């Protein structure tokens, strides 16, 4: 089951803020008036630690005290509102659950996603309210895929609107040009061999990627639609991406993955910061 945390956070912020606001407008004034009446009934209550002050405090708690729900709303609303703003418009943390982006990202990596790199969007509705930039080839991007529109995915931008993307014999072509590949190592992995290399998309400094010899990849050629992006995982033979479920609409973009800040694979392991750093 996918938990829509942004929706829950928005509901909690609006609920706590609404309770605090309604209390301030409708009920808080009555409690203040009652406390003033009680102050007249306890002369000397302004003297700290006096009997009158203690009796006055007890009476206020009993007859003019702030309801618990209002107290909680007043305490939590500012904190939750700050969290909502940070997660919605600045940076949001995510955990990597699969190996589709190996070797760039490993299972258990905790990453930060820049939420304003491609424009500011309202939480839940995903409506863009301010243009700031657009995805570029080579960006590692978080988004909602067309076949699971409530699940976060992370892949690399391979094609922009209008690009022709081809894949033949595990070789990538962009706009008819062969994407340079430099193979760095071959590593045995059980019954197959993993080839790790570096790939240089047009206009980028290159990134790590890997394939294996278990099976042949399906050849294809496609033109990226207007307002869409073609996404692929760096673990080319172990990634469900645009080759399977199609292109990603601009409206379903979440943000740009910019850094790893921690690695923690499971509750049985020890958190590590050795992989902390920028995402290439």
Which stretches of residues belong to each language-model region?
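Soluble "head" domains of membrane/secretory-pathway proteins
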Residues: 2-31, 38-39, 45-69, 94-95, ...
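Transmembrane alpha-helices and immediately adjacent membrane-cytoplasm interface residues
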Residues: 66-95, 116
């Amino acid at each position: 089951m996918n938990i829509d945390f942004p929706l829950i956070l928005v509901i909690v912020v609006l609920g706590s803020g609404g309770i605090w606001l309604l209390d301030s407008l409708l009920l808080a004034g009555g409690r203040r008036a009652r406390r003033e009446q009680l102050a007249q009934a306890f002369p000397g209550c302004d003297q700290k630690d006096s009997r009158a002050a203690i009796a006055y405090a007890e009476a206020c708690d009993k007859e003019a005290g702030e309801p618990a729900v209002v107290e909680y709303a007043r305490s939590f609303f500012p904190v939750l509102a700050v969290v909502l703003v940070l997660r919605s418009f600045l940076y949001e943390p995510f955990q990597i659950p699969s190996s589709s982006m190996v070797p760039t990202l490993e299972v258990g990596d905790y990453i930060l996603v820049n939420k304003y790199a491609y424009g500011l969007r309202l939480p839940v509705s995903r409506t863009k309210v301010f243009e700031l930039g657009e995805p570029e080839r080579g960006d590692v991007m978080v988004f909602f895929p067309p076949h699971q529109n409530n699940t976060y995915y992370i892949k690399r931008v391979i094609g922009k609107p209008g690009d022709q993307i081809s894949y033949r014999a595990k070789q990538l072509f962009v706009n008819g040009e062969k994407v340079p590949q430099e193979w760095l190592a071959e590593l045995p992995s059980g019954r197959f061999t993993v080839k790790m290399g570096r790939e240089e998309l047009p206009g980028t400094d290159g990134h790590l990627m890997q394939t294996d010899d278990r099976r042949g990849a399906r050849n294809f050629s496609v033109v990226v639609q207007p307002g869409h992006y073609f996404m692929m995982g760096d673990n080319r033979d172990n990634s469900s991406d645009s080759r399977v479920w199609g292109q990603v609409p601009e409206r379903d973009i979440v943000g740009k993955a910019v850094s790893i800040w921690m690695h923690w694979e499971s509750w049985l392991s020890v958190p590590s910061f050795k992989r902390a750093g920028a995402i290439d």
